[in-house]
């Protein structure tokens, strides 16, 4: 009977390497932080490490060498990095865009404190949406597209001083209503109507100047209320 010549040590070691490579590639494939390109690159690196390990096993001359090369190969396979650089870089770019936009908002003198805070909160909201979209992207191209879309959305957050504009519009409307009432007051002479309407315009200007100088929504509202009251208090007295 022939003595069997079965290289079980090397075969078992290479099978173990193949299993380690399969397990690592499965982990890479199922890593949601990696893009398609990052997964493919990492799995190619695993295949490279597996080949090196099996070549080293084939070159080994003792069971101890085989075991050592199997161990080294398994460690090298498991050490292949799963680093989501594309998504990390994209999210860092979104964070920088958000920081720049919030600085611009904070330094805008036309905005009230509340408008600044609301605009900055909107920036944070757009940044979060962008980063969530980046996390959900599956390719480098998707990541770049979501990064660019997020930066555009952040930069598009309006810096519109609506509180002051609305307050001044309300003062203008109060002035218009008051002047209409004066004009339609049959008890007043032409000169009395003109004098009263000039006083209304004066009060409206004072109110709008005060609104422009306000720094908070509360200040704006207070100046609007004071101005409207002053306009409505202009007398319609037929002397």
Residue ranges and their predicted role:
Residues 1-239:
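Thr-biased low-complexity repeat/linker tracts and other Thr-enriched repetitive architectures
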């Amino acid at each position: 009977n022939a003595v069997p010549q079965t290289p079980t040590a090397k075969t078992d070691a290479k099978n173990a390497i193949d299993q380690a490579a399969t397990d690592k590639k499965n982990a890479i494939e199922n890593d949601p932080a990696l893009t398609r390109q990052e997964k493919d690159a990492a799995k190619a690196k695993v295949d490279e490490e597996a080949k090196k390990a099996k070549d080293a096993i084939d070159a080994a001359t003792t069971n101890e060498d085989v075991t050592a090369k199997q161990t080294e190969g398994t460690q090298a396979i498991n050490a292949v990095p799963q680093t989501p650089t594309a998504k990390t870089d994209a999210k860092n770019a979104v964070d920088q865009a958000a920081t720049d936009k919030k600085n611009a908002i904070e330094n805008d003198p036309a905005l009230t404190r509340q408008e600044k805070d609301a605009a900055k909160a909107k920036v944070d909201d757009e940044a979060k949406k962008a980063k969530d979209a980046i996390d959900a992207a599956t390719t480098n191209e998707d990541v770049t597209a979501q990064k660019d879309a997020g930066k555009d959305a952040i930069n598009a957050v309006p810096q519109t001083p609506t509180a002051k504009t609305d307050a001044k519009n309300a003062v203008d409307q109060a002035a218009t209503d008051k002047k209409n009432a004066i004009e339609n007051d049959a008890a007043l002479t032409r000169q009395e109507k003109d004098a009263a309407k000039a006083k209304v315009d004066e009060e409206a200007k004072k109110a709008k100047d005060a609104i422009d100088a306000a720094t908070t929504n509360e200040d704006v509202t207070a100046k609007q209320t004071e101005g409207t009251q002053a306009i409505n208090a202009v007398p319609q007295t037929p002397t």
